[in-house]
Amino acid sequence: ATKLTTAANAILLQYSAPIWIALFGAWFLGERATRADWFTIAAVLGGMTLFFADSLELAHALGNSLAVISGLCFAGMTIALRKQKDSSPVESIILGNLLAFIIGLPWIIGAPALSTSGWIALTLLGTVQLGFSYWLYARAIKHVTALETVLIPVIEPILNPVWVLLATSEHPSRFALGGGAIVITAVTLRAIATIRTRGARAPGPHAT
């Protein structure tokens, strides 16, 4: 999708995953989206649209379609992992990444040899950026709803300009700042509301 449309379009449409989970989560998981969930989804998508406003384009229908399919696949993966909340989702993640490796093997064989720095970067990406983050994701999905596991990571692309600013002093646009603030605020308020709701439902220390 990133080769057939803009990066902004691809990222925004991939994060349509919360919509698919809100629609299908009730059927497959029994987790029905609440009014607060839909409000959060609308705020997040609105904020991300504003965040990427400078780069969004209406063309590139094929690339945009592939990005939507990517979001649907992300939602499907999350629902499948949440379905295993009482067992161990890690095995499914390992098998999925092994399958991805097998599919990508023909391109690896024909690629130029990696330098030492390339192998170091590949190792870090495999163990930290993917391995450790997937391990955390598998643990988190046991304790939160499928919708929450895709809403909270939305802050990841929003924080990218912050790291760029710290590393290169490149300032994000006003649209990016405004959109990012909306997304972070919506996700934070949703998380606080969820914590309070679960705290109110939890039995007290003297409950029998």
Model-predicted segments: where are they?
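Hydrophobic alpha-helical transmembrane segments of multi-pass membrane transport proteins
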Residues: 2-4, 23-24, 50, 66-80, ...
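Helix-loop interface residues and adjacent transmembrane-helix termini in multi-pass membrane transporters
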Residues: 4, 30-32, 86-87, 143, ...
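Hydrophobic core positions of alpha-helical segments in small-molecule transporters
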Residues: 13-14, 36-39, 62, 69, ...
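Transmembrane alpha-helical segments that form core, pore/gating elements
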Residues: 21-23, 55-111, 122, 204-208
